[in-house]
Amino acid sequence: MPEKILIAIAWPYANADIHVGNLTGSHLPGDICARYHRLRGRSVLMVSGSDSHGTPITVKADSMGVSPLEIYQAHHARFLELFQKVGISYDLFTSTHTSNHFFISQLAFTTLKDNGYLYTATEKQWYSTTQQRFFLDRYVEGTCSICGNPDAR
């Protein structure tokens, strides 16, 4: 039975095209490693995916007047095209938008909660009464109410 190798690459936010630094800093080295181990007869699983729910996606969607889903879908498709063009050999390049990811995330959360590793707490957050939503930290600019930094974001 061949040795099993897992290569897990960091998931890029799907809010912009992958730049040369992303490609050469994580995806290409992972691919080189996977190819090496495959040549050595090892069973390799190289995985990654698009982070479709991060704050950068929401920020870009708001700035463009479109939904976060539209931003994610466009960039995820371009990621796949790029990897195919340069020959990156992912066994699975998925996203945080799949039903499987949702299921596994919920399972991890409920398992932690059921075993006493999570707790309920109250936290102050910025809220817009005009937009009727809470603001992520990247949307809040001005003087920090905690440290007094006048250029806080």
Model-predicted segments: where are they?
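N-terminal, positively charged nucleic-acid-binding surface of large information/translation enzymes
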Residues: M1-R153
